[in-house]
């Protein structure tokens, strides 16, 4: 496998996982306030 492909897949996975986590954190902060 190409290193570039692995990096792209890794970045896409991080973005996919980080997106919902950020939304949840913001929602919890608003809920706490």
Swiss-Prot record:
Keyword field: Chloroplast, Membrane, Photosynthesis, Photosystem II, Plastid, Thylakoid, Transmembrane, Transmembrane helix
Keyword match Chloroplast: yes
Main subcellular localisation: plastid
GO process terms (BP): photosynthesis
Transmembrane domains' residue ranges: 5-25
Function: A core subunit of photosystem II (PSII), probably helps stabilize the reaction center.
Protein's UniProt name: Photosystem II reaction center protein Psb30
Gene, per the UniProt record: psb30
């Amino acid at each position: 496998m190409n290193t570039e492909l692995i990096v792209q897949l890794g970045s896409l996975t991080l973005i996919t996982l980080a997106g919902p986590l950020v939304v949840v954190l913001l929602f919890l902060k608003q809920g706490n306030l």
